[in-house]
Amino acid sequence: MAAQGFLLIATFLLVLMVLARPLGSGLARLINDIPLPGTAGVERILFRLPGVSDHEMNWKQYLCAILGLNMLGLAVLFFMLLGQHYLPLNPQQLPGLSWDLALNTAVNFVTNTNWQSYSGETTLSYFSQMAGLTVQNFLSAASGIAVIFAFIRAFTRQSMSTLGNAWVDLLRITLWVLVPVALLIALFLIQQGALQNFLPYQAVNTVEGAQQLLPMGPVASQEAIKMLGTNGGGFFNANSSHPFENPTALTNFVQMLAIFLIPTALCFAFGEVTGDRRQGRMLLWAMSVIFVICVGVVMWAEVQGNPHLLALGADSSINMEGKESRFGVLVSSLFAVVTTAASCGAVIAMHDSFTALGGMVPMWLMQIGEVVFGGVGSGLYGMMLFVLLAVFIAGLMIGRTPEYLGKKIDVREMKLTALAILVTPTLVLMGAALAMMTDAGRSAMLNPGPHGFSEVLYAVSSAANNNGSAFAGLSANSPFWNCLLAFCMFVGRFGVIIPVMAIAGSLVSKKSQPASSGTLPTHGPLFVGLLIGTVLLVGALTFIPALALGPVAEYLS
């Protein structure tokens, strides 16, 4: 089984790199503000109609444009969900959502989290799924990519104050990247058997003679961008373990590739735009090393079987609880690491049913900031924060002013970097503490003891880091949990974007210094090791006490 696991990982990474390389070249053109062939005329028309200016923006203007679009989207989606019963395409006559669930849902889709405190097939109409959630899947993904576009430009421009135009970037990302690729994935899913219709739910007779109501809907179109945009919110409650969303082993493989496709392509684009492709490869090596180790640990933990079942004398040579038999342990383990390394959160197995160590790894991947490939845009700018921190640490060790790609890293940048890195750990630890201190928080736990605490810790980690997956034993659809998680999602998203844009604004105004004999090389294996060590050190120091109370205590008990 070990050989099968390594072959699965190797095949996945090989196909991923082959697909991401050409996409990275296309993204590099967009970062360099070069329209794709044949698109300039369409862009001019689209900007002329609403009268949008395409002039360059400084970091504050760029940030305000991103925040303004997202706040508008949040308000529209919130009221759409409240008044769902007045809107069309609601064949099941589903009522509007409560204010707290509508708020939670609006925030989580705008922030690219897609935490779901509801069951899609019994809560949301087709109109809400399409015009509400799917639209935000595109816009939230485009927002994250636009931020990393601006951040990359900060390293390639010198003595300037502008970082591009947010509206131009958002339009190009959506029209020329997200929509075409999502369309191809959606057509493939439909060909493989995923649903795409507007029929009312179908009553069918089962082989046992009972009657069952099968949900319908425009599934494939939402499923495609859900994966490509690392959104993760399922059309159905079972998410990608549902055969109507993910019908075959081939669609499952394609969905995993879709999750990592843009984050990987952005690393290639980063190297191409900066004029040193080794920089992009350095990031990919660091991410890949952590990723492969994490997949190996989860696979090992899950093939050991469930120790609680073994203690009762049951046959549990592998842990199949909560897993689809058509996918199995190895594929489920790989998917779990893919979806939590990226800020996706889609699942084909119930993470709450993983072994203690098998469930701890996905939780820890979220807690370190979703920087191992990560979300579209957010993963790379999150990892770049650790790059700046690693450069700063190396500068202290050798007694030189830290610099990266020729840009001096001063006190202002390091303060903002520390602020951005500390946002999500603060939310996670304080949110988990608040939940455990209140009756409303503790009453949602399905399990007592360490596993119950793990459910709480996982939920807050998922929300604050904009992942969206869950230990589903937590009953999170209550005013307390909906509001707590909405706050964590909102601050976890925009509380990081704001200092990231401020760092970009500071760096773009600096001159690039030529490399000297004392410059730290940031493309070799030494720096890869330093970067991995920085990520692990920050993650270990921050979360080991909390993890010791949850999954570690469960493993040792």
UniProtKB/Swiss-Prot annotation:
Cell compartments where the protein resides? Cell inner membrane
User: Which of UniProt's keywords are assigned here?
Assistant: Cell inner membrane, Cell membrane, Ion transport, Membrane, Potassium, Potassium transport, Transmembrane, Transmembrane helix, Transport
Please give the Gene Ontology molecular function terms for this protein.
P-type potassium transmembrane transporter activity; potassium ion binding
Where, by residue number, does the polypeptide cross the bilayer?
A: 5-25, 63-83, 132-152, 170-190, 253-273, 283-303, 329-349, 356-376, 379-399, 416-436, 484-504, 526-546
Q: How does it sit in the membrane?
A: Multi-pass membrane protein
Assembly, per entry: The system is composed of three essential subunits: KdpA, KdpB and KdpC.
Matching entries from PANTHER family are given as:
POTASSIUM-TRANSPORTING ATPASE A CHAIN, POTASSIUM-TRANSPORTING ATPASE POTASSIUM-BINDING SUBUNIT
Q: What is this protein called?
A: Potassium-transporting ATPase potassium-binding subunit
State the organism of origin.
Answer: Shigella boydii serotype 18 (strain CDC 3083-94 / BS512)
Q: What is the lineage of its organism?
A: Bacteria, Pseudomonadati, Pseudomonadota, Gammaproteobacteria, Enterobacterales
